[in-house]
Amino acid sequence: MSNDLTSESKTANRAAGEKFRDADKLAHIPIKVVSSTKATMLRKPSWLRIKLPKSSERIDNIKANLRKNDLHSVCEEASCPNLSECFNHGTATFMILGDICTRRCPFCDVGHGRPLAPKSDEPKKLANSLKDMGLKYVVITSVDRDDLRDGGAQQFADCVKEIGEQAPNTKVEILVPDFRGRMDRALEILNQNPPHVFNHNMETAPRLYTKVRPGANYQWSLDLLKRFGEANPDVTTKSGLMVGLGETNEEILEVMQDLRDHGVTMLTVGQYLQPSKDHLAVERYVHPDDFAMFEREAKKMGYEHAACGPLVRSSYHADKQAAGEEVK
């Protein structure tokens, strides 16, 4: 039995809603992750220092709103380094379909296990929350839901529709999983209620997929972006990459070109940061000059907008990205 099948059967035997993280989460992935120690961890450079906010009032308000509506933010679940800045700015990336993922990507801090059934009232609660916070731009993402026949596509579509009805002035970006084995069904559903921006992250170079994205397929992800873009030519397609996982600058440039060849016009490139000692180690810290080079090359390739910087994340200042403003 393959590692994938073995891990899936072990997950199936666990109680729904039980969440596993760090070493417990990564115990059965195809390529084992060796836990880091202080001696093996690279020291963070000065340009990765994060400014802490002077006040947490805005942060507390957004967290309270999320709790009140039984919602999750990927900012919290994935331990994003920009949480304080984004929450203080009054923006958040909402994570629908629960906080338990069916996959075990070793770069990601989201918990793994058997997810609970989707909540039918989640789209309405999400729209109400947006209206309460007065957000003009929102990013909706999700865990992978390989347990669902549509991969969770209907929940995305319902959220987009509900927000359009309750908060018509709010622009919506969806950051979707790859809908493994369910692309036709998922696209048929998503095309009925398209967002303003369609985002799916490639994450890394194809050479590293078995290590970084076990269960995913490089060409499949490219095809997902291309097919949605062809069906919805007025919708911007977007993707994001991480650096520091063992790739070369040349490989990142090749992925950037592949994305352009598949119709993607918006790009983010940021530094990978290790969530815990049990996750994939950072193999290099990319200098800001290299990020500036990625941005220059992206413009040459024809990207309409590219945000490249050490702390840039896929949904970091997504409102500014969509408006074509500079993001660092």
UniProtKB/Swiss-Prot annotation:
<feature type="domain" description="Radical SAM core">
    <location>
        <begin position="87"/>
        <end position="304"/>
    </location>
</feature>
<feature type="binding site">
    <location>
        <position position="315"/>
    </location>
    <ligand>
        <name>[4Fe-4S] cluster 1</name>
    </ligand>
</feature>
<feature type="binding site">
    <location>
        <position position="86"/>
    </location>
    <ligand>
        <name>[4Fe-4S] cluster 1</name>
    </ligand>
</feature>
<keyword id="KW-0004">4Fe-4S</keyword>
<dbReference type="GO" id="GO:0051539">
    <property type="term" value="F:4 iron, 4 sulfur cluster binding"/>
</dbReference>
<protein>
    <recommendedName>
        <fullName>Lipoyl synthase</fullName>
        <ecNumber>2.8.1.8</ecNumber>
    </recommendedName>
</protein>
<dbReference type="GO" id="GO:0046872">
    <property type="term" value="F:metal ion binding"/>
</dbReference>
<keyword id="KW-0479">Metal-binding</keyword>
<feature type="binding site">
    <location>
        <position position="108"/>
    </location>
    <ligand>
        <name>[4Fe-4S] cluster 2</name>
    </ligand>
</feature>
<feature type="binding site">
    <location>
        <position position="80"/>
    </location>
    <ligand>
        <name>[4Fe-4S] cluster 1</name>
    </ligand>
</feature>
<dbReference type="InterPro" id="IPR031691">
    <property type="entry name" value="LIAS_N"/>
</dbReference>
<keyword id="KW-0408">Iron</keyword>
<keyword id="KW-0949">S-adenosyl-L-methionine</keyword>
<feature type="binding site">
    <location>
        <position position="105"/>
    </location>
    <ligand>
        <name>[4Fe-4S] cluster 2</name>
    </ligand>
</feature>
<dbReference type="Pfam" id="PF16881">
    <property type="entry name" value="LIAS_N"/>
</dbReference>
<feature type="binding site">
    <location>
        <position position="75"/>
    </location>
    <ligand>
        <name>[4Fe-4S] cluster 1</name>
    </ligand>
</feature>
<feature type="binding site">
    <location>
        <position position="101"/>
    </location>
    <ligand>
        <name>[4Fe-4S] cluster 2</name>
    </ligand>
</feature>
<comment type="similarity">
    <text>Belongs to the radical SAM superfamily. Lipoyl synthase family.</text>
</comment>
<dbReference type="GO" id="GO:0016992">
    <property type="term" value="F:lipoate synthase activity"/>
</dbReference>
<dbReference type="Pfam" id="PF04055">
    <property type="entry name" value="Radical_SAM"/>
</dbReference>
<dbReference type="InterPro" id="IPR006638">
    <property type="entry name" value="Elp3/MiaA/NifB-like_rSAM"/>
</dbReference>
<dbReference type="GO" id="GO:0005737">
    <property type="term" value="C:cytoplasm"/>
</dbReference>
<comment type="pathway">
    <text>Protein modification; protein lipoylation via endogenous pathway; protein N(6)-(lipoyl)lysine from octanoyl-[acyl-carrier-protein]: step 2/2.</text>
</comment>
<keyword id="KW-0963">Cytoplasm</keyword>
<dbReference type="InterPro" id="IPR013785">
    <property type="entry name" value="Aldolase_TIM"/>
</dbReference>
<dbReference type="InterPro" id="IPR003698">
    <property type="entry name" value="Lipoyl_synth"/>
</dbReference>
<keyword id="KW-0808">Transferase</keyword>
<dbReference type="InterPro" id="IPR007197">
    <property type="entry name" value="rSAM"/>
</dbReference>
<keyword id="KW-0411">Iron-sulfur</keyword>
